[in-house]
């Protein structure tokens, strides 16, 4: 019997060995194709590309005159200028600017640009506040002087006055060998006019190193690498089949049988994938509902801006920072989004990849991952509900936008599934596909290391499979396809870039930052605990539930060496993926909280596993289950000890979006902490009670499956928050309502932001009843103003901001404008007015004084109130100072009194009928000019007149106020006013909320000049976008600050008057100059060619 059994067992083994021996051709194909794919993939970064070259030459068209050419890299590769001395001789006695790379009156122009300037006594060549050479004008106008030569390259900046000698008799030249002296260029600007004289020339080589496309050779290599890799993987699959065992992968690769044939579709689709449960319906509905009403992620505007600009630029530039360098080597996902912008820029469309990723994650979890964790998990309905609810709650705060964490979560899950499939069937093809998936996941973003963690977690079993197979077919036929699979991503990453350009882009990002060391990883968890949007209720729960389930599972698995019906190998590998990811995240350059979205899928699987591990069938002692319930209550207390905040416009109308949630004055966190204390105390009692105590029906119900209940509760809270926001905001802007309107062509926030194009047009006419009694301030001051004067405003009072020294980037022109008017205004005021108000038409009254303080009062004349209509919903008073008012962010802000009193017609005279406290967005910034808003809807329809009543009863010098007359502004939507064709600098935070506005583009190294700038709310502008887009960091504000003047416009959020939605700024040009015409060409560059380092130094 033993010999017969041994003979039957050895027969198939000999057959398998014979099959492997006869597969010589397949082995050679796998080896050669794999090596070819590997070599071609690795060679791709080194192969040549075709660069689009661009030169800026001046003068243009044979005429002298300024031209604009703002470089996206800010500085050129090199710059040369030649100025004949005859040009200096022909200049007027006062001199002027011969040439400059920026307007002389631009912000910090001397600090950034190069100038050749002639004064009455000298000729100066200056560069970035450094005097390169200064020569007396009389020497330059002498016959000996021939020309002035200026060069600025990586070798330094030098000036040479050809024909002149220094005191030692040497040629008169000077300079500094500093590559950081290369000037910023936004054009060529001059005071010269007329035909261009012979010999006057400026030439700048624009840095277009990133504007490349593959050569034919490189394109063939990319195609060859991809084809060879596919062939190698097919050959590896063929080698896998030689063991004579079937698999799902084998079934899928067989020729399809007709679906109508018996069992055709059933053989094509596994049984587990053909079911549809209530859990599936809830998850799918949850994802679809959240896609419409849910909050977006923090960087959606940033990523959409890059995607919208990429097609025109010719590459995926990091548009807002880092000198326009590309996102490579982590950017292929953004290129997918760039392709999607050809269809639409609407939020619902652009966020489809994350929606699809979430749905696929659930299908993989429910059909592949949970069954792999063992029969106990597969058979547990609470486990499936736990996975579903945790997936939703982890996805909602992190992965409902354009950020790539959702794609990475899917990539990591696919990698894990393929690794498990490889082990289940002892096949290497799934492992090779897992390597491909991990490589492409890592190519999305550095945090794609989570997929690498999945490979590492399954590395040992895969190595055992490799060793077993190598004895049969050799090493190279197995290793070569793996090498090709792991490196084929290079053909995508370096498709249109080279090794040199990607290294330079990486250097720029690392040098400028943020680029934090591995030992600062604690910052990520610190930000999560702060009471900010990054540490909001939803974000805390999305990660902390995963962490709690992870450590609980580790503790139980270590205590219980064997748990019936739980697969230890897959379970430990799942935990290894999460622990490995936490470790690898230490080495990512940024420490943002939104990276926790990576854990959404594996966290859901961990929640399912933990649900089984803490169930009564595993934890039989109620003490342990109650301890876990107490831990859940503590987690909820920690999660609720913050705001219910969501990013930017997603928070509009959401309850408690800027405060800790409360019920009847008691914080929800306190309630959950009390429940934690009760549960922990009961668990402690159970520890000392007899072992069978505490097994009542209530305790068993509470502790059987708490994870899906808690996660389901939190999912309901998130959805309810968004629904409440929509209801409270309707019919004005909310995230969900905007998405609904997108189906009929809505333009997001641009439809609801109202712009006042002409602030001088809406002033009301004062009634003449008391005109003979008006004081020196006219109708604004009324009959007897006390303490108000035409100049009662301190210097440097600007619109919607507080002046800080030194000035921040992105500030308005009024920060640097003269603080006094040269001609007094209509009532003698010399104070500049904001928002384009004309002092010749608009009076001013204020209480600020540096002398003795007094209590001040003002009651203006009555102003005729137009009849109400939908086009004029507001009465506005432009004011400054510490004023009592209401705002969405701060509620009621105490201060001095500025109210609007309205009147009804009476017998022979107007009858005051009530007063209105203003909606004041900037009450916490008392020095700022702003528009106080009084909604017409809150006034009686038969009110016929209004007047301003102002009282400054404080004797503190800082408690001053200033007012202008009331007006009824004529408003237009931002979409109507700005439109969809004018170039706009859309700050990175606002891009997704304004999908119809045209972002300023760039191509061939030159940026488009914007007409407007749209910013987020005051705090976000000051702390986030102004600093991030600073020219010092290679941002777009380096262009606009130097070339343009910004003026904030009066804007309002429709029917949400007390909300600071952001701002619209209009740009005025400093110099009326046309765009420069560039000399374009092409050049073939090797993968190692570099024009030198981008200037990022001070």
Curated annotation (Swiss-Prot):
GO terms for cellular component: peptidoglycan-based cell wall; plasma membrane. Changing residue 297 to A: Resistance to EMB. Induction: Positively regulated by the transcriptional regulatory protein EmbR. It is found in: Cell membrane. GO terms for biological process: Actinobacterium-type cell wall biogenesis; cell wall organization; response to antibiotic. Its EC number is 2.4.2.-. Changing residue 328 to Y: Resistance to EMB. It is a multi-pass membrane protein. Changing residue 959 to A: Resistance to EMB. The chain crosses the membrane at residues 28-50, 217-239, 271-293, 402-419, 434-456, 472-494, 541-558, 570-587, 597-619, 626-648, 663-685, 698-720. The keyword Nucleus does not apply. It holds the Pfam family Arabino_trans_C. It comes from the Bacteria. One of its GO terms (molecular function) is arabinosyltransferase activity. Keywords: Antibiotic resistance, Cell membrane, Cell wall biogenesis/degradation, Glycosyltransferase, Membrane, Transferase, Transmembrane, Transmembrane helix. Coiled coil: none annotated. This is one of the targets of the anti-tuberculosis drug ethambutol [(S,S')-2,2'-(ethylenediimino)di-1-butanol; EMB]. EMB is a first-line drug used to treat tuberculosis. EMB inhibits the transfer of arabinogalactan into the cell wall. Belongs to the emb family. Arabinosyl transferase responsible for the polymerization of arabinose into the arabinan of arabinogalactan. This is Probable arabinosyltransferase B. The lineage of its organism: Bacteria, Bacillati, Actinomycetota, Actinomycetes, Mycobacteriales. The gene is embB.
């Amino acid at each position: 019997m033993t010999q017969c059994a041994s003979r039957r067992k050895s027969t198939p083994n000999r057959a398998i060995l014979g099959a492997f021996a006869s597969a010589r051709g397949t082995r050679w194909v796998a080896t050669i194709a794999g090596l070819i794919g590997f070599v071609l993939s690795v060679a791709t970064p080194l192969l040549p590309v075709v660069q689009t070259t661009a030169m800026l030459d001046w003068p243009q068209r044979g005429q002298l005159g300024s031209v604009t050419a703002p470089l996206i890299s800010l500085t050129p590769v090199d710059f040369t200028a030649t100025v004949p001395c005859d040009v200096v001789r022909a200049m007027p006695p006062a001199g002027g600017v011969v040439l400059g790379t920026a307007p002389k009156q631009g912000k910090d122009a001397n600090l950034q640009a190069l100038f050749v300037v002639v004064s009455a006594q000298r000729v100066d060549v200056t560069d970035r506040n450094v005097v390169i050479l200064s020569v007396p004008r009389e020497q330059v106008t002498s016959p000996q002087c021939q020309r002035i030569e200026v060069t600025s390259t990586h070798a330094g900046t030098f000036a040479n006055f050809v024909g002149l000698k220094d005191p030692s008799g040497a040629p008169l030249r000077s300079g500094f060998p500093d590559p950081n002296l290369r000037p910023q260029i936004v054009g060529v600007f001059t005071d010269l006019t007329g035909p261009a004289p012979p010999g006057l020339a400026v030439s700048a080589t624009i840095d277009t190193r990133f504007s490349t496309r593959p050569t034919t050779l490189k394109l063939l290599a990319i195609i060859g690498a991809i084809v060879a890799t596919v062939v190698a993987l097919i050959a590896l699959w063929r080698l896998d089949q030689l063991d004579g065992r079937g698999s799902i992968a084998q079934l899928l690769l067989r020729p399809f049988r007709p679906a109508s044939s018996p069992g055709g579709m059933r053989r094509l689709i596994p049984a587990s994938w053909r079911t549809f449960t209530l859990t599936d319906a809830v998850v799918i509905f949850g994802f679809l509902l959240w896609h419409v009403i849910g909050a977006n992620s923090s960087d959606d505007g940033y990523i959409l801006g890059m995607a919208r600009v990429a097609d025109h630029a010719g590459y995926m530039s990091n548009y807002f920072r880092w000198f326009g360098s590309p996102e490579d080597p982590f950017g292929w996902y953004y290129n997918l989004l760039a392709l999607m912008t050809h269809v639409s820029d609407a939020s619902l469309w652009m966020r489809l990849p994350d929606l699809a990723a979430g749905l696929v994650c659930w299908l993989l979890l429910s059909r592949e991952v949970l069954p792999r964790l063992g029969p106990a998990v597969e058979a547990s309905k609470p486990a499936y509900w736990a996975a579903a609810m945790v997936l939703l709650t982890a996805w909602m705060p992190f992965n409902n936008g354009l950020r790539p964490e959702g794609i990475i979560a899917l990539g990591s899950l696919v990698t894990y599934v393929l690794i498990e499939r490889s082990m289940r069937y002892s096949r290497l093809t799934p492992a090779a596909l897992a390597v491909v998936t991990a490589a492409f996941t890592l190519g999305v973003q550095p945090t794609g290391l989570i997929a690498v963690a999945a490979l590492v977690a399954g590395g040992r079993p895969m190595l055992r499979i490799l060793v077993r197979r190598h004895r049969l077919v050799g090493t190279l036929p197995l290793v070569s396809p793996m090498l090709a699979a792991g490196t084929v991503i290079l053909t995508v990453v370096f498709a249109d870039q080279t090794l040199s350009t990607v290294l330079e882009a990486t250097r720029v990002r690392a040098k400028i930052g943020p680029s934090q060391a591995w030992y600062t990883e604690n910052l990520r968890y610190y930000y999560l605990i702060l009471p900010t949007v990054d540490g909001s209720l939803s974000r805390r729960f999305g990660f902390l539930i995963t962490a709690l389930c992870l450590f609980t599972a580790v503790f139980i698995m270590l205590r219980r060496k064997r748990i019936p019906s739980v697969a230890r190998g897959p379970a430990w590998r799942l935990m290894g993926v999460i622990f490995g990811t936490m470790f690898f995240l230490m080495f990512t350059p940024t420490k943002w909280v939104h990276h926790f979205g990576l854990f959404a899928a594996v966290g859901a699987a961990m929640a399912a596993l933990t649900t089984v591990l803490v169930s009564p069938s595993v934890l039989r002692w109620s003490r342990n289950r109650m301890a876990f319930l107490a831990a859940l209550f503590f987690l909820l207390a920690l999660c609720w000890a913050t705001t219910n905040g969501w990013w930017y416009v997603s928070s509009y109308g959401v309850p408690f979006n800027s405060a800790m949630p409360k019920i009847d004055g008691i914080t929800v966190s306190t309630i959950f902490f009390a429940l934690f204390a009760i549960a922990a105390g009961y668990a402690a009692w159970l520890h000392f009670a007899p072992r069978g105590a505490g097994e009542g029906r209530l305790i068993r119900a509470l502790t059987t499956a708490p994870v899906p209940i808690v996660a389901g509760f939190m999912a309901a809270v998130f959805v309810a928050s968004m629904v409440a926001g929509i209801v409270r905001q309707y019919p004005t802007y909310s995230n969900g309502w905007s998405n609904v309107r997108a189906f009929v062509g809505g333009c997001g926030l641009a439809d609801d932001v109202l712009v006042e194009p002409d602030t001088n047009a809406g002033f009301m006419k004062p009634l003449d009843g008391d005109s003979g009694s008006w004081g020196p301030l006219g109708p604004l001051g009324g009959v007897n103003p006390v303490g108000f004067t035409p100049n009662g405003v301190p210097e440097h009072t600007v619109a919607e901001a507080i002046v800080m020294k030194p000035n921040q980037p992105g500030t308005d022109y009024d920060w640097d404008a003269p603080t006094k008017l040269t001609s007094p205004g209509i009532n003698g005021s010399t104070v500049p007015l904001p928002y384009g108000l004309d002092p010749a038409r608009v009076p001013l009254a204020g209480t600020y004084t540096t002398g003795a303080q007094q209590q001040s009062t003002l009651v203006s004349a009555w102003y005729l109130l137009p009849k109400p209509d939908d086009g004029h919903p507001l009465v506005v008073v432009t004011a400054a100072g510490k004023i009592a008012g209401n705002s969405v962010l701060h509620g009621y802000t105490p201060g001095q009194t500025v109210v609007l009193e309205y009147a009804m017609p009476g017998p022979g005279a107007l009858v005051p009928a009530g007063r209105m406290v203003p909606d004041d967005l900037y009450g916490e910034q008392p020095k700022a000019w702003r528009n106080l808003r009084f909604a017409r809807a809150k006034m009686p329809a038969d009110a016929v007149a209004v007047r301003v009543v102002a009282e400054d009863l404080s004797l503190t010098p800082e408690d001053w106020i200033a007012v202008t007359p009331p007006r009824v502004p004529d408003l237009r939507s931002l979409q109507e006013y700005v439109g969809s064709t004018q170039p706009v600098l859309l700050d990175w935070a606002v891009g997704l909320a304004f999908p119809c506005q045209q972002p300023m583009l760039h191509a061939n190294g030159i940026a488009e000049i914007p007409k407007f700038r749209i910013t987020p709310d005051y705090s976000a502008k000051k702390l986030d976008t102004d600093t991030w887009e600073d020219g010092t960091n290679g941002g777009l504000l380096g262009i606009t600050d130097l070339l343009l003047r910004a003026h904030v416009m009066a804007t309002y959020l429709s029917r949400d008057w007390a909300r600071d939605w952001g701002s619209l700024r209009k740009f005025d040009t400093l110099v009326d100059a046309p765009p420069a015409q560039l000399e374009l060409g092409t050049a073939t560059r090797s993968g190692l060619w570099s024009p030198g380092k981008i200037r990022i130094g001070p």
